[in-house]
């Protein structure tokens, strides 16, 4: 093969990383931070508030350079799946004397600025409050608890604990270090999910104090 990576091969992911390694050279010449995971690449650029308009102009330049590199290497940038977000404190955003553009142009697509984006399973909002991530996490964990609850009468305690650990606690544990410093009311929402999980496993009444039961489960 002159271009690309053989699909379905065992070495495919490794070969793809090697194949796209030179992309970092194109990005770094613009002094842009970047992170890549398989075929997912993220670009990050910081600037003082008064330089935001210039930042958008330079952003368009290195996006065009990336597309040129991909065309040269017979790769296609998925314009429709590209996301963009401005991260700032809410207070500073409100104090700016100008408004942010509504979108950036990527190829033939106009990519609107998002209030939140998902990065490897973690949802980041534009003010890094983690509110959206916690809300999504609580919703998905409660959904799994309801599914397990519907068959709880068929399961032993150990089997229920295994299912809860696999489908609920694993979600709470994933990247939980990012929640350090979050307001207590957000952490309380996650604690409530864990409490409900313990009640489901041990068939504990809602009126019972949950701390001893969490300790017995080593949670």
Segments the model singles out, each with a brief description of its role:
Residues 65-66, 72, 79-80, 172-187:
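Charged boundary/loop elements
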Residues 8, 23, 39-41, 59, ...:
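Mobile genetic element proteins and their domesticated derivatives, centered on retroelements
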Residues 13-44:
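Active-site palm subdomain of RNA-directed nucleic acid polymerases
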Residues 108-179:
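Basic, alpha-helical interaction scaffolds
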Residues 1-15, 44-50, 126-127, 149-156, ...:
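Short, conserved non-catalytic motifs in the polymerase core
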Residues 67-86, 92, 189-219:
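Short, charged alpha-helical motifs in flexible N/C-terminal segments and linkers
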Residues 41-67, 71, 89, 180-181:
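Catalytic palm subdomain of template-directed nucleic-acid polymerases
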Residues 61, 72-115:
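Short, conserved micro-motifs composed of acidic
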């Amino acid at each position: 093969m002159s271009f690309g990576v053989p699909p379905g091969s065992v070495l495919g992911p490794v070969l793809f990383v090697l194949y796209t390694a030179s992309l970092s050279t194109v990005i770094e010449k613009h002094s842009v931070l970047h992170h890549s995971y398989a075929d997912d690449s993220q670009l990050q650029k910081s600037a003082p508030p008064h330089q935001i308009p210039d930042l958008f102009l330079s952003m368009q330049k290195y996006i065009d350079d990336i597309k040129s590199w991909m065309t040269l290497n017979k790769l296609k940038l998925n314009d429709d799946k590209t996301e963009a977000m401005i991260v700032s404190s809410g207070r500073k955003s409100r104090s700016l004397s100008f408004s942010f553009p509504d979108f950036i142009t990527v190829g033939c697509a106009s990519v609107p600025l998002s209030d939140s984006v998902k990065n490897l399973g973690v949802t980041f909002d534009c003010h890094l409050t983690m509110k959206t991530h916690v809300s999504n996490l609580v919703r998905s964990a409660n959904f799994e608890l309801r599914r397990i609850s519907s068959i709880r009468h068929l399961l032993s305690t150990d089997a229920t604990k295994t299912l809860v650990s696999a489908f609920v606690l694993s979600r709470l544990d994933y990247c939980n270090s990012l929640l350090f410093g979050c307001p207590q009311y957000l952490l309380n929402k996650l604690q409530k999910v864990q409490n409900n999980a313990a009640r489901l496993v041990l068939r504990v009444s809602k009126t019972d104090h949950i701390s001893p039961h969490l300790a017995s489960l080593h949670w």
